[in-house]
Amino acid sequence: MKNWLPVMALTFVIVSCSNEKKTMKEMNPFYETYTAPFGVPPFDKIENKHYLPAFKEAISRHEREIEQIVANSAKPDFANTIEAMDKSGELLNRVSNVFFNVKEANTNDSIDQIAEVVAPLLSQHNDAVNMNDKLFAKVKVVDDQKDKLNLTREQARLLEETYKRFVRGGANLPADKKEIFKKINTDLSLLELKFGNNMLAETNGFKLVIDKKEDLAGLPETVVVAAAEEAKTNKMDGKWIFSLQKPSWIPFLTYSQKRDLREKLYKAMYNRSNNNNEFDNKSVINKIVNLRLQKANLLGFESWAAYVLDDCMAKTPKNVYDLIGKVWTPGLKRAKEEAKDMQDMIVREGGKFKLESWDWWFYSEKVRKEKYDLNEEEVRPYFELNKVREGAFTVANKLYGLTFKQLQNIPLYHPDCQVFEVDDKDGSLIGILYMDFFPRASKKGGAWMNNYRDQYHYEGQADVRPVVSNTFNFSKPAGDKPALLNFDEVETLFHEFGHGLHGLLTKCHYRTLSGTSVARDFVELPSQVMEHWAVEPEVLKMYAKHYKTGETIPQKLVDKIIKAGKFNQGFITTEFLAAAILDMDYHTITKAEEIDVEKFEKNSMEKAGLIPEIIPRYRSTYFNHVFPGGYSSGYYSYIWAEVLDADAFEAFLEKGNIFDQEVATSFRKNVLEMGGTEEAMKEYVNFRGKTPGIEPLLKNRGLN
């Protein structure tokens, strides 16, 4: 069974009449075999009223499956215990995958209410499984005899991961501590849900309304048109609205000549859920941090970070801080140089003010234009969304022989979605890929990959192929122009598509190990390595076509992009690592305490030496990755994986061919297809033939 219990979830009135219950059960699409093409979820049939009954039935069904494993009188072995557990929970996986994906991408009040009921239900059920003494006793019997069972590598790995999940889930705790552990998990499930809901409410709650045309000075036409359309949507015709969605606030901060308005929008962005109102997250953070510490202590770890990292490649907080330090020092040095360049420009222009954090985007863009004669708006017309998407598909075709066919008449959870059939070079089905591109009030911010169906292939049964989703928040079409991406968005598309390939190309027997079920600091390797192809001149010429003329991006412009590729890397590196440090500082606390969140963050950044012109990429109260998300004590993973991805791409460069088939096949076989069937570093060494060093990362960022 997969780690299928995302801790979130619901309020719904359940019909009490037995006949009505029977009717609801019969009509609930989750209980039927999906009949839509390729077995994708029947979004056209699923209604909010179906979720809670389906969750309750799925939990009940899974309980019965666990009881059957426990009641089996045969001697515990791999098949009747470990594999049986992996096979269990099919309905719960199905319901959870749909519900939580929709919760993130297209939520509403009803779904949010449902989530509040389901979160504790799932937490309690998860604990009931992990702390089932009779079940764990059977797992221990199998683990004790593992050397005599002649297990395959994958079977041995599944046994290892299953045993570890029980131990890390509290199975070895005494009865009284188990009850405390369960209560902590239930409380955390609700707090993490509340954090995310608060952040979404704050993000949606702010609008910068502009009613004077002169206040639009400096903004590109596409940005102005999009703001006018947003105002029209909000029944404010003749005005312009800028929001806290990235495609809105980033271009405003980059191009607006109105410094006071840049400051207003920026402060609204970085003060989300820090406004001492009903959506404030400071007390939520306090509770989450202290409950996590208490949970780690119960399991014998001195801090939450020590607990989390024990199951990662990094292993210890010290190793994480050491890596951060190696990149932080040159990154901060470069950031100070960049800040000086911008302050010098302010002085040259007659400015009488000091560079502030809300000035960075504006002046860095001006410096880029001055140094490299490159304006982001100059390249945007060459990055039409559908062409960029096709570029990513072409890279996958050249590397792995994959083909992508857009499907029509497929059930969608939102009209913005596109769906693709992905086939291998021999024509066999690889899987189905959903892509959801644009921001909306019902969608959380950021970009991510999830599964609607995991891949697995049990002995003697058909290979179940995955249904994968890539979700984004890209710039929408504006006026008569299609969706035109900036280069950051181009890299984001390639990044999430890399995650998608990891989920699609997996070839595992067991659901628990398939796809992205790998160490957290390894999971970003397939995504980040894909970003390298996005900027390769050979690839740019495949997809970067002017949306009006069809002209391929000129070599002169490609040269500018490459030359400016390391521009602003001090800022990019430092703001990211500042957030990683903040995450680690919260989660290396070893003593329960009342945390003054603002003071804690200030002290953390001062200790690290962060300059005042830069704030962490995510401040505490909207740090969605680590408080409700799955990256607590793990935001460093992106830089850890960058050590791997920079070294991995070097393997192609060493061959003189970015599409070298020998290297691509090795990466597919040893990384993408393997899922979590092998220890992460072993997978990497099997591909690369050596462990990675940090030098390629520093070189890529221009920090060497």
Q: Where do the model's predicted regions map?
A:
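C-terminal motif of bacterial Sec signal peptides marking the signal peptidase cleavage site
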Residues: 15-16
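Active-site-proximal, well-structured secondary-structure segments within enzyme catalytic domains
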Residues: 158, 190, 197, 201-243, ...
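Short, hydrophobic/amphipathic alpha-helical patches that form generic packing surfaces
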Residues: 91-101, 160, 164, 267, ...
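Short pre-active-site segment immediately N-terminal to the catalytic Zn-binding motif
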Residues: 475-494
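Sec-dependent signal peptide recognition
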Residues: 2-8
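Short His/Asp/Glu-rich catalytic/ion-coordination signatures at enzyme active sites or charged loops
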Residues: 35-50, 99-118, 141-183, 243-283, ...
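C-terminal, non-catalytic "cap/extension" segments appended to globular domains
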Residues: 23-50, 57, 217, 239-240, ...
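N-terminal helix-rich structural modules
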Residues: 23-219
